[in-house]
């Protein structure tokens, strides 16, 4: 059996702004569920039939804002494989999202990075090869 990430659950301040970000990056994403949990907190599943992001409304404000790559425990970014990173970049740039792409050149892949409205970093990668040894080359 192939292992895959079925979903990720992220607590956010503004669910609707996050939905807009995700649907800008992935126009095929749909709202799978939008409701209020037993604790009175809104949560939404946005994605496809096979993968999604669960967005949960923040109920407690953190002492410090999370900053990706700060060296503190937490998720630095989530990465999605896409067919064409240039289209994703164009869509996100047109919508005003912050491009955080670091210089990266590789013969077998192209990567871009963007911040969502919550300050989380997202990676989008396009592979130019179907060969695992080339896709997994980190030189």
What are these regions (language model features)?
Residues 1, 4-14, 32, 44-47, 65-139, ...:
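Vicinal oxygen chelate
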Residues 54-56, 123:
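Conserved beta-strand in the GNAT
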Residues 6, 30-32, 76, 100:
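A short, local hydrophobic-aromatic micro-motif
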Residues 50, 57-59:
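Short, small-residue-rich loop/turn micro-motifs
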Residues 2, 9-52:
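Core segments of cupin and vicinal oxygen chelate
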């Amino acid at each position: 059996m192939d292992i895959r990430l079925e979903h990720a659950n992220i607590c956010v301040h503004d669910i609707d702004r996050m939905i807009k970000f995700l649907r800008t990056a992935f126009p095929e994403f749909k709202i799978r569920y939008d409701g209020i949990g037993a604790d009175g907190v809104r949560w939404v599943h946005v994605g496809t039939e096979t993968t999604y992001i669960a967005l949960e409304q923040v109920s407690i404000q953190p002492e410090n804002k999370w900053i990706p790559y700060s060296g503190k425990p937490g998720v630095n970014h989530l990465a999605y494989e896409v067919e064409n990173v240039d289209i994703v970049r164009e869509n996100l740039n047109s919508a005003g999202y912050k491009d955080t792409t670091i210089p990266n050149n590789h013969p077998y892949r192209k990567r871009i990075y963007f911040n969502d409205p919550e300050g989380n970093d997202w990676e989008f990668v396009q592979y130019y090869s179907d060969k695992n040894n080339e896709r997994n080359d980190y030189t």
